[in-house]
Amino acid sequence: MKRVWLCGLAFVISACTPPLAPAAKADPDIPQWKTSNSMGCMMVRACKDDTKLITSRKDLGSGYDKYAYELNTIFAATNKIGIKVYLAGDKYFTPKTRGLYNVKGNNLFISEDIIDNPEMVMGVIRHEGWHAVQDCMAGSVTNGMSALVWTKGEVPSIVWDGVIADYADTPQAIPYEAEARWAAYSNYKTADGLVACANPRVKIWEEYPPIPSTKQWLIKQGYIR
């Protein structure tokens, strides 16, 4: 089980979109942008300048028609769950970071720097959206925890190899990032997971039978018997 403040840094395969939501007023002084400090300020919503709430595919602008059904499904689910998706200024993100999901605040952020690249934006939404699925799989999106959904064998070895190389300094994140990266490459996996999370009648672990470590956690916390 993983408790994280920042859950998921989507690298080269990520991106998102513009739209509505007024800019915030005075933000805290940030001594240096494009750092973990500026990302953290954005994630906890202490910094709101140059961030826009997006609630539908239309907020992303043109070029997303080929992903219409998948995006409509994702936004319908995130809106129902209460996950807020923001398009944010590139100044907040560390180099190579294109998206973030905050497991404690249930906020998903996409760098506006990639908005004109629908393929990259879709990768980011799928990747960070899968971290929201992991959040849900830990029992509730309100408990600040994440749980694995798939067994190691369900993620292709080539994906594992890339994630192991990228996250050598944070090995505890590797299985979570491997799942998210595989979801980013896959049509509808994130959409399906978020739909399961948003279903008020059926728990997500009834749709996705939990792997042993996740099942143990759910039993220990009283989510299942």
Name each region found by the language model.
Residues 2-8:
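Sec-dependent signal peptide recognition
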Residues 14-15:
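C-terminal motif of bacterial Sec signal peptides marking the signal peptidase cleavage site
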Residues 20-31:
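Short, low-complexity, disordered segments immediately C-terminal to signal peptides
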Residues 22-23, 37-104:
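Auxiliary, metal-adjacent structural segments of Zn-dependent hydrolase domains
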Residues 67-74, 121, 125-129, 176-179, ...:
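Stable alpha-helical elements in mature extracytoplasmic
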Residues 108-125:
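Short pre-active-site segment immediately N-terminal to the catalytic Zn-binding motif
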Residues 129-146:
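Catalytic Zn2+-binding segment of zinc metalloproteases
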Residues 145-225:
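Metalloprotease/metallohydrolase-associated module, dominated by Zn2+-dependent proteases
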